[in-house]
From Swiss-Prot:
Keywords: Aminopeptidase, Cytoplasm, Hydrolase, Metal-binding, Metalloprotease, Protease, Zinc. This is Peptidase T. Disulfide bonds: none annotated. GO terms for molecular function: metallopeptidase activity; tripeptide aminopeptidase activity; zinc ion binding. Its EC number is 3.4.11.4.
Amino acid sequence: MKNEIIERFTSYVKVDTQSDENNENCPSTPGQLTLANMLADELKSIGMTDITVDDNGYVMATLPANTDKDVPTVGFLAHVDTATDFTGKNVNPQIIESYDGHDIVLNDKLNVVLSPEQFPELSRYKGQTLITTDGTTLLGADNKAGIAEIMTAMAYLIKHPDIKHGTIRVAFTPDEEIGRGPHKFDVGRFNAAFAYTIDGGPLGELQYESFNAAAAKLTCYGKSVHPGTAKNKMVNASKIAMEFHHALPKEEAPEYTEGYEGFYHLLSMNGDVSEAALSYIIRDFDRDRFAERKEYMQKTADALAAKYGNESIKLELRDQYYNMREKIEPVKEIVDVAYQAMKNLDIDPIIEPIRGGTDGSQLSYMGLPTPNIFTGGQNFHGKYEYISVDHMEKAVNVIVEIARLFEERA
């Protein structure tokens, strides 16, 4: 199975599918549709049915039930796009057989080294087969590992009809990394009782809590005057923006928070004297605290507007997704089945909140409860990203075992 996983995964990552938040089309980049069509062809070749690719790049397919039992339809999802944080063009995956536990030189010329000194968890993978970058791009394990694992699991079930299962639906979605993955996802057409995203990190991750999330854009408007004659006339938009940012709690930022702690995160800033813009994301697990964070931003903007004039400040707040725990807890069995599947395979489940979001965060509020399961990857969204093929194989086995357990329990 390892070679099958490697072949699939390395072919997927070579397609540039980086999404683009500045493009309102769906998918936001043509490479995503290219990969979607490739995946549809592969689904057909392994024996899946009801395969569709719509104009928005959503791939769906069915593995029909091979049992007479009344088993709820389960879905498995992964997203085709890669993050905007680092380039995903010309990905050149490197395969490290029987990792020796020492430094991995990703790129000698650029002196890019994946070291257990900097990334201590790397030592846990000694003896395993790793796939890394060449030091110039991200890898794309987020989330092409999930695609490879779902595809391999479906191929395995088709080749092993002795493993009984209910109807399984598969979907590969666009634009998850820019928060739009489920926006045009047809839950009714997908027609599953519940689903799992295969979009987590290290072995054993099982997640059914996510952030509540919002985006904020602050635009400041100033008055540009020649600096030689600016006294009592100039209003510097960039300084207003700086004042706003410094009013936010310094310790409530990603680099200072963990676990269930929320944050304000400055994504980008640009400007001059006349106009300046700050883009933020707001995150918190608690719904009330989430509301308080948005209110604090609004009050800060209002105070600056009172100081510099109402025309000097514009704050736009937009909710992105909510903590999916609220929708999953009423059907907690789906978490319990995934937990048992891992235990059956001698995998220690790690139940922890997602300090981020998945398609499941939004899908759960669209009527499709969707927890998240590990892929086996580490250091997503950058040149130090890597994944264990051994753990990818375990993810495949978990998918198969989940399908088997639901049939057994029916």
